[in-house]
Amino acid sequence: ERGWFDILDDWLKRDRFVFVGWSGILLFPCAYLALGGWLTGTTFVTSWYTHGLASSYLEGCNFLTVAVSTPANSMGHSLLLLWGPEAQGDFTRWCQLGGLWTFIALHGAFGLIGFMLRQFEIARLVGVRPYNAIAFSAPIAVFVSVFLIYPLGQSSWFFAPSFGVAAIFRFLLFFQGFHNWTLNPFHMMGVAGVLGGALLCAIHGATVENTLFQDGEGASTFRAFNPTQAEETYSMVTANRFWSQIFGIAFSNKRWLHFFMLFVPVTGLWMSAIGVVGLALNLRSYDFISQEIRAAEDPEFETFYTKNLLLNEGIRAWMAPQDQPHENFVFPEEVLPRGNAL
């Protein structure tokens, strides 16, 4: 006798245009609510009460300048539930306090996890290995570290990125000014992973296109391919000879080549996520104190490192009063950074 679980299992895994599955119970509601919350916030909701900013289409922003802003610093790490003590069930007040940000961040995180579980589930049903899901763990790690773990290490959700294009750019400048993020080795590994992955992708695609078998008469080489054909569609031997002539070494194993293409960007993103967890704890890296001391003592000595530190000071001094108006920062002229050349 089949129970309700088996009946539900059959329905969830039924062959349909968009597969649902058990993962869909988490994925579809969370993705719908996160995207819907973002579209609602960017269309109607102001950031006047949290950041002193206009951030919606209703206020005159465009696609690049709208955002769903983080809650005010005074909210701390409250989940800002609609029925919580801050909003007390008042939807308008909840939006004004920044409740949409926590709503989107949490539903977005669970939506991404649901998408990874979807890849696990379908891989199991189709009978393939789960490397797609493993690879997707990298962007999830970056999202969770940047949007959740970093602000949890700071004083409030206020210091997380707001959900918007220009808002993310502001956050990048904040990370540079307050953490010297570009000199952090974990960021360097992240850049190497992303750019290295792009390079590998371009090289691989070009090499395959270069070595396609001439097995059709059409103007387009794409027409000669059949997804059910048994034979190879390009010559690995020719590709190997081509790169052997250029570099002296080349991949001779397709499985190792494709694992390497998986490994480079995924490892880079994971390293970057680990670095952001370090920033959540205000860890520092690569402070070249000897250069700083010499630059302070010798007016003629300056390096790109010491110049960048001055730029960071400038970001902090000019950004903090704008970015954190609730602190009422006032920096007198004499504390603003001056380079040795000045």
Swiss-Prot record:
Keywords per UniProt: Chlorophyll, Chromophore, Electron transport, Iron, Magnesium, Membrane, Metal-binding, Oxidoreductase, Photosynthesis, Photosystem II, Thylakoid, Transmembrane, Transmembrane helix, Transport
Miscellaneous section: 2 of the reaction center chlorophylls (ChlD1 and ChlD2) are entirely coordinated by water.
The enzyme's E.C. designation: 1.10.3.9
Residues the entry annotates as binding chlorophyll a PD2: H187
Pfam families noted in UniProt: Photo_RC (PF00124)
SUPFAM superfamilies named among the record's database cross-references: Bacterial photosystem II reaction centre, L and M subunits
Database matches in InterPro entries: D1/D2, Photo_II_D1/D2_sf, Photo_RC_L/M, Photo_RC_L/M_CS, PSII_PsbD/D2
Binding sites annotated in the UniProt record for chlorophyll a ChlzD2: H107
Transmembrane domains' residue ranges: 30-50, 114-130, 142-155, 197-217, 268-284
Quaternary structure and partners: PSII is composed of 1 copy each of membrane proteins PsbA, PsbB, PsbC, PsbD, PsbE, PsbF, PsbH, PsbI, PsbJ, PsbK, PsbL, PsbM, PsbT, PsbX, PsbY, PsbZ, Psb30/Ycf12, peripheral proteins PsbO, CyanoQ (PsbQ), PsbU, PsbV and a large number of cofactors. It forms dimeric complexes.
GO terms of molecular function: chlorophyll binding; electron transporter, transferring electrons within the cyclic electron transport pathway of photosynthesis activity; metal ion binding; oxygen evolving activity
Organism listed in the record: Thermostichus vulcanus (Synechococcus vulcanus)
GO cellular component, one term: plasma membrane-derived thylakoid membrane
Positions of a plastoquinone binding: H204, F251
Catalytic reactions of this protein: 2 a plastoquinone + 4 hnu + 2 H2O = 2 a plastoquinol + O2
Name of the protein in question: Photosystem II D2 protein
